[in-house]
Amino acid sequence: MSTEGGFGGTSSSDAQQSLQSFWPRVMEEIRNLTVKDFRVQELPLARIKKIMKLDEDVKMISAEAPVLFAKAAQIFITELTLRAWIHTEDNKRRTLQRNDIAMAITKFDQFDFLIDIVPRDELKPPKRQEEVRQSVTPAEPVQYYFTLAQQPTAVQVQGQQQGQQTTSSTTTIQPGQIIIAQPQQGQTTPVTMQVGEGQQVQIVQAQPQGQAQQAQSGTGQTMQVMQQIITNTGEIQQIPVQLNAGQLQYIRLAQPVSGTQVVQGQIQTLATNAQQGQRNASQGKPRRCLKETLQITQTEVQQGQQQFSQFTDGQRNSVQQARVSELTGEAEPREVKATGNSTPCTSSLPTTHPPSHRAGASCVCCSQPQQSSTSPPPSDALQWVVVEVSGTPNQLETHRELHAPLPGMTSLSPLHPSQQLYQIQQVTMPAGQDLAQPMFIQSANQPSDGQAPQVTGD
């Protein structure tokens, strides 16, 4: 054991004096030990015995061995503490730290076996400097882009229409904004509305090419809603949104049809623009309605026809020709040729016919199969109406009134340029669910302030 008196300094302190007299005092205590002194130890003997049993080579432990190890450990701890306390006093501190023990181990060779157990802080690699963490907003919102198609081709923030690119104003997209691109007559006017904390809805209105009021044929063009999601990494993902339009049972035509057109399973959205209509009326131009169609896939049409044929027991009424005398203003009666048993206008449903309708003549509402009110058809059955309209004028003048009788529906009041147009559709609900009233989808005139059209359901 070492009996050095200190770190070599001339000046002696309390710790150095205690260290110099440490070993002579310890030797004196060992010589004066008695049997009673071995019974009481400062360190627990049971814990020392448990540590000794960790060695697999140790089979048995005598009663004197733990006592000797306890006494030796006590002397070792006392000497190491005194040497560490000297380093504490040199640093003018009153608290013993881990670094003090490490310095005492490195300065004395007898403690070399503890270097790996208690390494010096200086030998440690420098601590990693705390990186400046970027402020991350909680749950950074994802940008959503919704495209509302008012024309046969979808118009986005930067899209193409009629084969020519429609350039819209470039806007700076902030996180948490919902941008809705919607074409409208007039100039491009971005409108921003605050909808919630940290979220904005921006409506961008793009001016289409050419005459926007000209009726567009929906051949090969469908209305599709694409949802573009920009992730936190900057990648843009386009996810198509499936429209739950259901199966259409009644189709209401409220616009002029040029030539011969067969309407089969199509959803038509009617929209009028009062400002453009007034401008054309003042210039002597006829007013036209904007028509958009949503094509239903051929598979859904075939499935609907099969279900309809099963529901009507093979008796499928096909309307071949219908002359709309209300649009031409002629006094000719409305004639409809149907392949089936036509019954006079004695339907139990509240139906109002135009003045030109003759009593007993076949009509669309009367050609429908009579259904009992007590036994309604299955909710999943489909009724497809195939109408071929011909002999209609190519234009709808502003001073004409439009009457469109529908099966099972009361007559509507005359439509005016400033009046809202609705799309009437009856959706077939799944089995076990009934739709009490039809849905009314309002396609309102786009006001000058840039607000989006409203959708109401009664």
Curated annotation (Swiss-Prot):
One Gene Ontology CC term in the entry: nucleus
Q: Which GO BP terms apply?
A: positive regulation of transcription by RNA polymerase II; protein folding; regulation of DNA-templated transcription; regulation of transcription by RNA polymerase II
- What interactions and quaternary structure are annotated? Heterotrimeric transcription factor composed of three components, NF-YA, NF-YB and NF-YC. NF-YB and NF-YC must interact and dimerize for NF-YA association and DNA binding.
Provide the coiled-coil residue spans. Answer: none
Which family, according to the similarity comment? Belongs to the NFYC/HAP5 subunit family.
**Superkingdom classification of source:** Eukaryota
One family from Pfam that matches here is Histone
A molecular function (GO) held by this record is: DNA-binding transcription factor activity
> What is the official name of this protein in its record?
Nuclear transcription factor Y subunit gamma
Instruction: Tell me which CDD domains the record gives.
Output: HFD_NFYC-like (cd22908)
Which keywords appear in this protein's UniProt record, sorted alphabetically?
A: Activator, DNA-binding, Nucleus, Transcription, Transcription regulation
Q: Which organism is it from?
A: Homo sapiens
Q: List cystine links.
A: none
- Which parts of this chain are annotated as the region Disordered? 305-379
InterPro entries listed in its UniProt record: Histone-fold (IPR009072), Histone_H2A/H2B/H3 (IPR007125), Transcr_DNA_Rep_Reg (IPR050568)
The free-text function statement in the UniProt record for this protein reads: Component of the sequence-specific heterotrimeric transcription factor (NF-Y) which specifically recognizes a 5'-CCAAT-3' box motif found in the promoters of its target genes. NF-Y can function as both an activator and a repressor, depending on its interacting cofactors.
Q: Where is the composition biased (Polar residues)?
A: 339-351
